[in-house]
From Swiss-Prot:
InterPro entries: Smg. Pfam families: DUF494. The lineage of its organism: Bacteria, Pseudomonadati, Pseudomonadota, Gammaproteobacteria, Alteromonadales. This is Protein Smg homolog. It comes from the Bacteria. The gene is smg. Belongs to the Smg family.
Amino acid sequence: MFDILMYLFENYVHSEVELLVDEDELTKELTRAGFHQSEILKALTWLERLAELQEGDKPYLCNHDQHSFRIYTKDEMEKLDVECRGFLLFLEQVKVLNVETREMVIDRVMELDEPALILEDLKWVILMVLFNAPGHESAYEQMEDLIFEQPEEGRLHS
């Protein structure tokens, strides 16, 4: 499923090509690209749920204290190793993520069928969430820079 999400993001969203609106046409395109029907449906559902996080009358998170900190569940810690959790904290500290977008990222990570996520894959999930979060264009650009810039020697995070 993650491969399909990456394919869609790189070939449609990130390249600024208009995404096919018709789900049947998109499914046919993905099938022609070599993806299996069941994985295509999972990926499309994942994207629909991402879009749903942005919709509705209520914000994704209500009533959070700015001085609170995130305690990860056992399942979240299995999916997101120390490096990934540290990177999420780093992104919050440098204001790329806020509490709401961090929780959206964790929500989307937990819906992936991967048993654990590596840091590089987490970065792409973060990019997808920020791309779909209205009003977070600057954070998206910062995250894009973090993904595509060449790492410098001695840097803590790339």
